[in-house]
């Protein structure tokens, strides 16, 4: 299934060509990741991204891109309608009529070939006798009900065909049934990718997350002696996982941990550094959930800063530049500028559009916290400007910040300032902090030398 690659990124992303009319649109077009994402997605998974682009780009080009994307699938009626729209015609060529008839005939054939085994798998008395041992299950079905390997394989073929027709719910069920019985490891792996895609396209996020784990396990075991194959498959998994990542809240922690794991952060740095945008957005917005486990969040933030710093020469956008400006360069003016640009990028990104407000809110908190740590007396007007707020909004923001974070500070409304009470750090504590830093740097150098 994963091998069902999309048409070239250039062909499809031509529908997202820049038509700049203002700075916001220029920023969105400059940092459009669609050409980067397409090669790592199945063509059916690309379709929602093109749909999202419909409101942003030349509608005719988007329709043409959809046609190029889907013309080799079995979604015959939809493809025919796209052809009519492109050619401004009410009639369609005979080839579409012929293909539709062929698809219907093939569906009928697959339904008949798989009828016996699908009926058996819907029989509770039969299912009750199935065990975790696939070989034993197949032997039981063969001896008791005359099931053959060919019948099992028909489930796989039928599931793939239903997927190509856009019947993703049916495809998920058929591929699941096939996977329960088949001992063909290659086909089982393909069926797992297919079921993963089907669950994504039916927005069945819990089921999709179950498939994430199954695909991950398959990559580790089936491709154990194939590092290049592992790299490619992990890259696919990372990209496909973006769908549940930002649509299913429980997936956020699981996938953030996965992306930061050594094998996957290495894959991101080696093969697809643009994924840092999504990892950064996840970590920043996780600040709003930091009460769950503050130490985990701080570790994620430190890891993110480290990777952004390392990969700055390879990839950057306003989201990663915001991290760099705030935590590497300590440039608050640049951080404010990049936050404004990041907001435009987020609003134009299919995966991140729903996180925009949460990102901006969390980013403002991070700017405030960093700014307050290094200043004793803070001008409210100045800080408001850095947060992109007017003075009244900034004053309310700072009041809420002091209340929510319980920092030791007071507001002098007459002077328009915030006075921070930074307790002096003991010499003992300073030595501990410096020792920690020296120890960490020693570990990094040792690891580098060991390589």
UniProtKB/Swiss-Prot annotation:
CDD domains, per the entry: eIF3E
Keyword Cytoplasm appears in the UniProt entry: yes
Subcellular location(s) of the protein: Cytoplasm
Residue span(s) of domain PCI: 256-425
GO biological process: formation of cytoplasmic translation initiation complex
Keyword Ligase appears in the UniProt entry: no
Database matches in Pfam families: eIF3_N, EIF3E_C, PCI
Role, per record: Component of the eukaryotic translation initiation factor 3 (eIF-3) complex, which is involved in protein synthesis of a specialized repertoire of mRNAs and, together with other initiation factors, stimulates binding of mRNA and methionyl-tRNAi to the 40S ribosome. The eIF-3 complex specifically targets and initiates translation of a subset of mRNAs involved in cell proliferation.
Family: Belongs to the eIF-3 subunit E family.
The protein's assembly and partners: Component of the eukaryotic translation initiation factor 3 (eIF-3) complex.
Protein name per the record: Eukaryotic translation initiation factor 3 subunit E
Lineage, opening ranks: Eukaryota, Fungi, Dikarya, Ascomycota, Pezizomycotina
């Amino acid at each position: 299934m994963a091998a069902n690659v999309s048409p070239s990124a250039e062909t499809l992303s031509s529908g997202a060509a820049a038509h700049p009319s203002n700075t916001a649109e220029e920023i969105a077009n400059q940092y459009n990741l669609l050409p980067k994402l397409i090669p790592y997605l199945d063509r059916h998974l690309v379709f929602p991204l093109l749909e999202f682009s419909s409101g942003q780009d030349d509608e005719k080009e988007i329709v043409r891109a959809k046609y190029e994307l889907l013309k080799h699938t079995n979604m015959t009626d939809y493809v025919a309608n796209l052809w009519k729209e492109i050619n401004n015609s009410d009639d369609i060529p005979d080839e579409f009529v012929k293909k539709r008839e062929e698809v219907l005939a093939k569906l009928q054939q697959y339904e008949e070939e798989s009828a016996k085994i699908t009926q058996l798998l819907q029989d509770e008395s039969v299912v009750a006798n199935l065990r975790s041992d696939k070989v034993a299950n197949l032997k039981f079905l063969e001896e008791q009900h005359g099931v053959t390997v060919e019948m099992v394989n028909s489930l796989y073929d039928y599931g793939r065909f239903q997927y190509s027709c856009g019947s993703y719910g049916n495809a998920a069920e058929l591929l699941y049934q096939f996977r329960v019985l088949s001992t063909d490891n290659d086909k089982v792996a393909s069926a797992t990718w297919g079921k993963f895609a089907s669950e994504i396209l039916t927005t069945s996020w819990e089921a999709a997350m179950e498939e994430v784990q199954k695909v991950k396990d398959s990559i580790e075991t089936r491709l154990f002696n194939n590092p290049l194959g592992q790299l490619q498959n992990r890259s696919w998994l990372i990209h496909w996982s973006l769908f549940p990542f930002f649509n299913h809240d429980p997936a956020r922690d699981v996938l953030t941990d996965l992306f930061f794991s050594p094998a996957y952060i290495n894959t991101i740095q080696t093969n697809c550094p643009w994924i840092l945008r999504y990892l950064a957005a996840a970590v920043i917005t996780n600040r709003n959930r930091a009460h769950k486990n503050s130490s985990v969040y701080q570790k994620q933030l430190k890891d993110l800063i480290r990777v952004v710093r390392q990969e700055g020469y390879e990839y950057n956008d306003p989201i990663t530049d915001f991290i760099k400006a705030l935590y590497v360069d300590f440039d608050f003016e640049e951080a404010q500028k990049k936050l404004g640009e990041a907001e435009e990028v987020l609003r134009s990104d299919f995966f991140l559009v729903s996180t925009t407000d949460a990102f901006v809110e969390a980013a403002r908190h991070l700017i405030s916290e960093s700014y307050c740590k290094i200043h004793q007396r803070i001008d409210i007007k100045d800080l408001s400007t850095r947060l992109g707020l007017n003075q009244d909004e900034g004053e309310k923001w700072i009041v809420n910040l002091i209340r929510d974070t319980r920092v030791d500070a007071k507001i002098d409304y007459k002077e328009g300032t915030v006075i921070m009470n930074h307790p002096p750090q003991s010499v003992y504590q300073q030595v501990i902090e410096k020792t920690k830093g020296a120890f960490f740097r020693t570990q990094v150098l040792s690891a580098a030398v060991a390589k």
